[in-house]
């Protein structure tokens, strides 16, 4: 899989084709994060082939639909459980991100894993994604934004026209001192 652009969340439901031996086959539902529905179907068959003993030729996709965020204007903390293959083996990992949507948090995770661990998108498997309350977050880079009186330094000051003179002796210093 190539994780290009913002990843979207898809709910894919599939099953093994019914036969005379097994007329009622169970349905399998997965949450897949992919750039489009074609890649989502492909990832669904990839995971199902690993978990159950059938593949695309002996199965069918019953439904595929994109899952939209219920409140995309409220920032949330997301916990992501994943496993990835590195050069030294397979590792389990838990990561936390702050984002507006689940897709945005998972996209951040893929970018972060590529930057920090050189993990390619095809070697990352998302196990579980969950929204976490502020009290249950563990990572410092997420906890630092839970302060209600948080202040950000003004790195570059802006000189307003009303306060400055028409001519100046020197170039204005806008950097933070």
Curated annotation (Swiss-Prot):
Ranges in coiled-coil conformation: none
Keyword Ribosomal protein: yes
Biological processes per GO annotation: cytoplasmic translation
InterPro entries: Ribosomal_eL20, Ribosomal_eL20_dom, Ribosomal_eL20_eukaryotes
Gene Ontology, cellular component aspect: cytosolic large ribosomal subunit; cytosolic ribosome
UniProt KW Ribonucleoprotein keyword: yes
Matches recorded under SUPFAM superfamilies: RplX-like
Keywords: Ribonucleoprotein, Ribosomal protein
Domain of life according to the entry: Eukaryota
GO molecular function terms listed in the Swiss-Prot or TrEMBL record: structural constituent of ribosome
HAMAP family in alphabetical order: Ribosomal_eL20
Family (UniProt): Belongs to the eukaryotic ribosomal protein eL20 family.
UniProt name for this protein: Large ribosomal subunit protein eL20
Native source organism of the sequence: Drosophila melanogaster
Phylogenetic lineage: Eukaryota, Metazoa, Ecdysozoa, Arthropoda, Hexapoda
